[in-house]
């Protein structure tokens, strides 16, 4: 089960009071963030929702939003991105007093408040506040997808045949963001018609694996000059 499968299950059941999206793959965390914002119909002008990309200058305001009761609705959603104090990165956006306020929120979160944390990196499990967070929150860790998982994921959201997706995955070195870009590339090239394997070969740049295979083949055939040109 991929992190996207886990997220679909969470959406089916309804978002928990506290959700943490984290991982070392910025691309996958970013994709989950976009899906979350779509799921909750996020609107910056909606007073029942708040989003903060945390910095030392806005952290007090973010904590006040988190601690406040909703005024214009029955519930409030607060999304905090880049609360780096919770990760293994040696950085911080909250000072000690602010971090204690956040910890106090975790001790007794108001029923009317939903919190989503979006973090790039690993959680620092040694920290007391992270231990509390893990006990209270649903965790979604964005881990790199394997080749077949990539193909399966994009086959759900793309009309491209699996054979085409398999070739794109190979040419993308099984990288999520590169594969996403290459899918857009071949669809733009095809101008609405069905994408073929030939389209992929023509449009998608050769992967490192492709180049190594071609280089090895040229060397075995004694075509040294062509091999040098390839490099």
Model-derived features: where do they sit?
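Glycine-rich P-loop/Walker A and Walker A-like loops and their local beta1-loop-alpha1 context
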Residues: 1-37
């Amino acid at each position: 089960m991929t992190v996207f499968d886990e997220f679909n299950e969470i959406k089916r059941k309804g978002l928990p009071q506290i959700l943490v999206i984290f991982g070392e793959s910025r691309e996958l965390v970013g994709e989950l963030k976009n899906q979350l914002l779509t799921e909750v119909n996020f609107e910056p002008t909606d007073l029942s929702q708040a989003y903060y990309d945390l910095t030392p200058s806005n952290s007090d305001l973010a904590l006040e939003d988190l601690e406040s009761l909703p005024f214009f609705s029955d519930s409030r959603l607060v999304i905090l991105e880049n609360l780096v104090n919770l990760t293994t990165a040696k950085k911080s956006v909250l000072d000690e007093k602010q971090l204690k306020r956040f910890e106090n929120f975790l001790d007794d979160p108001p029923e009317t408040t939903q919190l989503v944390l979006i973090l790039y990196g690993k959680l620092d499990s040694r920290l007391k506040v992270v231990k509390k967070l893990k006990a209270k929150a649903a965790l979604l860790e964005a881990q790199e997808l394997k080749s077949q998982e990539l193909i399966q994921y994009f086959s759900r959201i793309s009309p491209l045949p699996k054979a085409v997706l398999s070739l794109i995955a190979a040419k993308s070195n099984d990288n999520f963001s590169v594969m996403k870009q290459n899918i857009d590339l071949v669809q733009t090239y095809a101008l609405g018609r069905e994408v073929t394997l030939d389209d992929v070969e023509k449009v998608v740049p050769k992967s490192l694996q492709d180049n190594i295979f071609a280089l090895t083949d040229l060397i075995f055939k004694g075509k040294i000059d062509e091999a040098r040109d390839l490099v």
